C-alpha cells in the first residue's frame, strides 16, 4: 500500500523561482544529496537528511542559467549551462563559478542528462545529442539539426537498458506530438508519431516514462484530466520508417482539466504514479498516488499553499515547490500482489526488517556510440578528476561470490556469503542476493549431497527474498524436511501459496519429538506455560474460575454435561498442559502467522490426516484457554498468535475436516469442549446485547426527560 509520510521543508530560504517554477532537481553522486537549480543564477546542493544546504554557486550578474545542473557520476563533478551555450564544470571545492572550467558551444543546449553508470549526454534544442567527453574535445564542432522547423522539445528522459544508454525526447509542432528514441549502442534514431486518439483537441500537460526489457512505457497527462499510456518498442522493426503509435487510456479523470497552476505526473515504480494537481471535487491542489495496475487511488495529500505544477522523484523522496519553499515528501510503497488483494497479509513488520531501495544495476557501458570516448585520459587539464576514488576493483565482490557458489565447498561458501553481507550494501545488492540463491538452488538440484542450509538462512534474513523470486527454495526444504528453514521462510515471505503452507503444516505435525529435540527452532513466539501449570492446578482446586463471565458448571447442556460429569482424573492435566512440545508449538505458531486466503486454503487442509488435525485442534484449544485467563485476551511472549488467528484456524480446520474428526473416538471430548467454547461465547455476546439494550433504553429515557421543557418551583419555608 502506498503511503505519503509527513512533509518537511528542505530549506527556509526562498528560491528564485520564476513563473514556471524551478529549472530542476537532480540527484548527486551521494544518495542523500540533491542539486536544486532555480530559474535565476543559483545552484544549491542540499542534504535531505540534515535539511540544510551544503553548498551554493551562482553565475555572474547579467548571466542566467538555462538548464538544470547535473552530476557527472563518473567524476563527481557538476555540470551546468548558462546563456544557452556556455558550459561550466566544477566540484565541491570550487567557490566561484566564474573561475571554473568553461566551454562555449556552437549550438543552444536544451538539457544535460546524467545517470549512474555512463557519462552525461548533452541534448541540443535542434535534437542532436553528444556525449560530454566528445563535446568537450571539440566544443565548437558543428551540431546537426534533427527535428524540423517549428518543432519544439517538450520533455526528455535518459535510461540505461542492458548496460546501454537510451534517450527519449518528445517534441510538439502545431498540436502534433512526436517521440524520438536514440539507441547509442547502435546509433539508431527512431521517430514516432503519437496519435492523440478521439480527442484531437486535447493538450498534453505532463509526461513520464518507465522502461522494461522490451518497451518504454510513455505516460502522459492530458488537458482532459486523464492519464494515457503509449508503449514504444526499444528495438523497432524498421528504424528508418516514421511509425505511428496509438495511446490507450490508463486512468480516467485523475485531475481537473481546469487546473490553474499546471499539473505534473511522475512514475514511482511499475505500478504507481504520482499526480500533482487539483482533483475534480476540490479546488485546492493535491498530491495523489494512483495504482495503475488496479486503477485505484492509494493516498492523497492536500497542498493548501499551492505549487508550481512541478514534481520530481528520486529514491523515496518527492520534491515540489509548496508555496515559495522547496518541500520534500517521503514516499513508501509495498509491491502490489494478489495476496494483498485476496488474502490475509501480516499487519506488523518485525523490528529487524528494513526496506531495501530498488535501484537499477547501473554498469558502465563498453563502447557506446555517438562520440563516446575513453575518459581515462582527459584532454582538459583544468578538470580535476578523482581517479583514485572512482577506480573499481578488477573483480567485484558480487562476481567473486557468484563464481564461488558454483564450485567451492559449503564451508567456504558460508564464509564468502558472510563476508559479502558484511560489506556496505550496493545498488545491485538485491540482484546479487537473488542470483546467489538461484545458483545455490541449481547446484542443490544437480548435487543431492550439496545443501548449504546455513548460507540459505543468512540470505533469507536479508529481507530481500520472497517465494515468487525463489520458489525452489521451499520445495527443496520440504524434501529435506528442514523445519528450521521452513519456519524462517514462513516468517519472512509474505507470498507463500496455500498449498506450500499446508505442506509445511503436514511436516510440522508429523515430525517426531526426538527429531525436533535435535533441531534449532526460533522460540520467540512460545511462552513456557509449565511455569504456571502447578499454580493453576491449585487454584482450580481451591476456587471456582469464571471464564469470560461464564461458569461452565452452571450451564447444563443435557448430553454434554452428562458426559463431562464423569471427569477422568487427568482432565485437569489436559486442560493446563500443552498438548505439543514447545518446539512444535513454535512451528505451528509460524503457520498461524502466515498469510492465506480461505478459498485457496480449505481444499489443501482436507489432505491432512485426521490424527494430525486433532492434534492441531487440541493445541489451538489450549491456546484459547490460555487467552481466556487474561483480561486482555492475549498470550504472553514476544510474538504470540492472536485470538483472531486462533479462532480463524479452528473454524478452518473444522470446516475442512469435521466429518472425519467427528468419527474419531479420541476427538469426542475435544469436540464437546469446542462446543462448550462456542456456547459460552454465544452466552457472553447475548448478555452483552442485553446490556446494550438496557443502556439504549436508559439513554432514551434521559433524552425524553431533557426534551420535556418543564420546570418546577420548590418553596422552602423558614421559621
Swiss-Prot record:
Listed Pfam families: Nol11_C, NOL11_N
GO biological process, one term: positive regulation of transcription of nucleolar large rRNA by RNA polymerase I
The UniProt record lists the keyword Secreted: no
N6-methyllysine PTM sites in chain numbering: 346
Keyword rRNA processing included in the entry's annotation: yes
InterPro entries: NOL11, Nol11_C, NOL11_N, WD40_repeat_dom_sf
Molecular function GO terms recorded: RNA binding
GO cellular component, one term: nucleoplasm
Subcellular location: Nucleus, Nucleolus
Record's signal peptide: none
Domain of life assignment: Eukaryota
Keyword set, alphabetical order: Activator, Methylation, Nucleus, Ribosome biogenesis, rRNA processing, Transcription, Transcription regulation
Additional free-text comment from the UniProt record: Is the likely candidate for being the functional analog of yeast Utp8.
Function: Ribosome biogenesis factor. May be required for both optimal rDNA transcription and small subunit (SSU) pre-rRNA processing at sites A', A0, 1 and 2b.
Assembly behavior: Interacts with UTP4. Interacts with FBL/fibrillarin in a transcription-dependent manner. May associate with the proposed t-UTP subcomplex of the SSU processome containing at least UTP4, WDR43, HEATR1, UTP15, WDR75.
Protein name in UniProt: Nucleolar protein 11
Name of the coding gene: NOL11
Amino acid at each position: 500500500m502506498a503511503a505519503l509520510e509527513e512533509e518537511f521543508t528542505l530549506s527556509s530560504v526562498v528560491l528564485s523561482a520564476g513563473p514556471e517554477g524551478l529549472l530542476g532537481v537532480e540527484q548527486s553522486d551521494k544518495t542523500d544529496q540533491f542539486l536544486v537549480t532555480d530559474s535565476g543564477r543559483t545552484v544549491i546542493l542540499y542534504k535531505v537528511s540534515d535539511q540544510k544546504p551544503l553548498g551554493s554557486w551562482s553565475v555572474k550578474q547579467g548571466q542566467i542559467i538555462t538548464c538544470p545542473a547535473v552530476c557527472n557520476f563518473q567524476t563527481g563533478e557538476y555540470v551546468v549551462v548558462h546563456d544557452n551555450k556556455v558550459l561550466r564544470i566544477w566540484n565541491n571545492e570550487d567557490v566561484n563559478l566564474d573561475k571554473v572550467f568553461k566551454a562555449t558551444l556552437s549550438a543552444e543546449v536544451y538539457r544535460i542528462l546524467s545517470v549512474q553508470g555512463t557519462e552525461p549526454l548533452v541534448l541540443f534544442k535542434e535534437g542532436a545529442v553528444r556525449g560530454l567527453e566528445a563535446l568537450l574535445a571539440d566544443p565548437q564542432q558543428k551540431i546537426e539539426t534533427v527535428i524540423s522547423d517549428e518543432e519544439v522539445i517538450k520533455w526528455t528522459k535518459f535510461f540505461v537498458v542492458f548496460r546501454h544508454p537510451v534517450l527519449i525526447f518528445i517534441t510538439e509542432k502545431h498540436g502534433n506530438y512526436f517521440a524520438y528514441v536514440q539507441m547509442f549502442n547502435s546509433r539508431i534514431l527512431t521517430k514516432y508519431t503519437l496519435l492523440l486518439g478521439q480527442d484531437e483537441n486535447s493538450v498534453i500537460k505532463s509526461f513520464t516514462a518507465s522502461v522494461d526489457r522490451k518497451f518504454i512505457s510513455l505516460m502522459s497527462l492530458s488537458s482532459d484530466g486523464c492519464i494515457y499510456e503509449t508503449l514504444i518498442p526499444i528495438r523497432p522493426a524498421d528504424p528508418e520508417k516514421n511509425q505511428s503509435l496509438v495511446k490507450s487510456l490508463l486512468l480516467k479523470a485523475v485531475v481537473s482539466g481546469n487546473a490553474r497552476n499546471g499539473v505534473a505526473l511522475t512514475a514511482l515504480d511499475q505500478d504507481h504514479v504520482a499526480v500533482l494537481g487539483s482533483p475534480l471535487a476540490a479546488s485546492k491542489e493535491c498530491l495523489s498516488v494512483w495504482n495503475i495496475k488496479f486503477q485505484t487511488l492509494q493516498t492523497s495529500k492536500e497542498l493548501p499553499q499551492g505549487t508550481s505544477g512541478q514534481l520530481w522523484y528520486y529514491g523515496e523522496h518527492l520534491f515540489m515547490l509548496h508555496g515559495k519553499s522547496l518541500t520534500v515528501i517521503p514516499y513508501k510503497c509495498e509491491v502490489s500482489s494478489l495476496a494483498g488483494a485476496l488474502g490475509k497479509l501480516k499487519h506488523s513488520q518485525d523490528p529487524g526488517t528494513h526496506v531495501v531501495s530498488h535501484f537499477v544495476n547501473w554498469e558502465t557501458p563498453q563502447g557506446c556510440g555517438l562520440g563516446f570516448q575513453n575518459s581515462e585520459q582527459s584532454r582538459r587539464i583544468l578538470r580535476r578528476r578523482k581517479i583514485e576514488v572512482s577506480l573499481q576493483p578488477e573483480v567485484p565482490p558480487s562476481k567473486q561470490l557468484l563464481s564461488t557458489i558454483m564450485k567451492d565447498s559449503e564451508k567456504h561458501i558460508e564464509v564468502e556469503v558472510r563476508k559479502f553481507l558484511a560489506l556496505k550494501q550496493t545498488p545491485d545488492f538485491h540482484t546479487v542476493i537473488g542470483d546467489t540463491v538461484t545458483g545455490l538452488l541449481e547446484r542443490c538440484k544437480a548435487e543431492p549431497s550439496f545443501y548449504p542450509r546455513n548460507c540459505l538462512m543468512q540470505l533469507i534474513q536479508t529481507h530481500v527474498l520472497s517465494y515468487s523470486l525463489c520458489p525452489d527454495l521451499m520445495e527443496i526444504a520440504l524434501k529435506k524436511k528442514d523445519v528450521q528453514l521452513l519456519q524462517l521462510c514462513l516468517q519472512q515471505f509474505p507470498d507463500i501459496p496455500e498449498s506450500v503452507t499446508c505442506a509445511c503444516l503436514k511436516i510440522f505435525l508429523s515430525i517426531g519429538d526426538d527429531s525436533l529435540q535435535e533441531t534449532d527452532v526460533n522460540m520467540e513466539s512460545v511462552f513456557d506455560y509449565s511455569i504456571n501449570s502447578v499454580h493453576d492446578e491449585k487454584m482450580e482446586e481451591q476456587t471456582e474460575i469464571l471464564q469470560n463471565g461464564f461458569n461452565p458448571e452452571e450451564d447444563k447442556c443435557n448430553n454434554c454435561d452428562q458426559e463431562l460429569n464423569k471427569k477422568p482424573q487427568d482432565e485437569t492435566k489436559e486442560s493446563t498442559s500443552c498438548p505439543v512440545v514447545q518446539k512444535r508449538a513454535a512451528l505451528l505458531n509460524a503457520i498461524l502467522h502466515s498469510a492465506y486466503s480461505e478459498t485457496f486454503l480449505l481444499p489443501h487442509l482436507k489432505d491432512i490426516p485426521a490424527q494430525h488435525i486433532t492434534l492441531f485442534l487440541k493445541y489451538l484449544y489450549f491456546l484459547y484457554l490460555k487467552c481466556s485467563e487474561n483480561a486482555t485476551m492475549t498470550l504472553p511472549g514476544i510474538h504470540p498468535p492472536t485470538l483472531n488467528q486462533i479462532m480463524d484456524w479452528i473454524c478452518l480446520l473444522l470446516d475442512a475436516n469435521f466429518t472425519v474428526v467427528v468419527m474419531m473416538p479420541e476427538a469426542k471430548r475435544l469436540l464437546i469442549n469446542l462446543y462448550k467454547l462456542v456456547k459460552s461465547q454465544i452466552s457472553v455476546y447475548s448478555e452483552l446485547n442485553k446490556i446494550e439494550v438496557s443502556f439504549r433504553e436508559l439513554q432514551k429515557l434521559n433524552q425524553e426527560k431533557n426534551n420535556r421543557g418543564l420546570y418546577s418551583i420548590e418553596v422552602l419555608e423558614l421559621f
